Amino acid sequence: MIKIKNLVFRYRNSSNNALDDLTLWIPKGKYVAILGHNGSGKSTLSKILVGLFKPTSGEVEIDGVVLNQESKNLIQSKVGIILQNPDNQFIGATVEDDIAFGLENKMLKSEKIKEIIDFYSEKVGMKEFLKREPQNLSGGQKQRVAIASVLALDPEVIIFDEVTSMLDPLGKHSILELIKDIQEKNSKTLISITHDMDEAIQADYCLVFSAGKLVASGKPADILNNKEIVELAKIDSPFIYKISQKLEGIEPTYDEEHLLEQICK
């Protein structure tokens, strides 16, 4: 479980708090989407959770461990993050080297490392690219490698920070399917930082940020149907929902099957 209490963060030379007295909790094993406009504080929170930023004040607790300078390494072993631009995460000369990097730091035997690399590269559909240089991959392929590298370390919490924002529709769909697969087959706590409701719609529930504050929480459908919150957080409605809104006699829905059922009645 992740507990955040009275969290404040202010960037140097800024007169406003990026996170302003934020209190929330995220249950273990749930998929949570954090929504909000640019500058709402959602990505700042993700960087605090992985120990990259130190809070101005307040408390962060992950799995019973309070985040501080002494516990930072332990917390970082529990939390993995995939960034918006995976190029910022690549270390190895090849896909294989990149997935292996964190495993080598765990002092695992080479046979075990090879086994883990094979398993997770196949899981994300990148096994045939193991000898490829990361910079020669497409955006979607790079994100898959970044996800494999994090999964290989077996963290308890995985944060996806705007992972689809730079991808084309095909790449975006591919990554969302992969996240859905991780959600269904693993007991991980997943946190998706996004402003895209297409990404958030498959979460168990959503947290909505605006100006560094938590302004709403609830199931994706409830958030989507709250026009005030949608406008405040500048949330972009899913494509299916936009279509259903324009069809006369159709109840707005984000579910494609439900929309087809209504049309065919």
UniProtKB/Swiss-Prot annotation:
Cell location: Cell membrane
Membrane topology: Peripheral membrane protein
Function according to Swiss-Prot or TrEMBL: ATP-binding (A) component of a common energy-coupling factor (ECF) ABC-transporter complex. Unlike classic ABC transporters this ECF transporter provides the energy necessary to transport a number of different substrates.
Pfam families, per database record: ABC_tran
UniProt-recorded name of the protein: Energy-coupling factor transporter ATP-binding protein EcfA1
Domain ABC transporter: 2-236
Species classification: Bacteria, Bacillati, Mycoplasmatota, Mycoplasmoidales, Metamycoplasmataceae
Annotated source species: Mycoplasmopsis pulmonis (strain UAB CTIP) (Mycoplasma pulmonis)
Top-level taxon: Bacteria
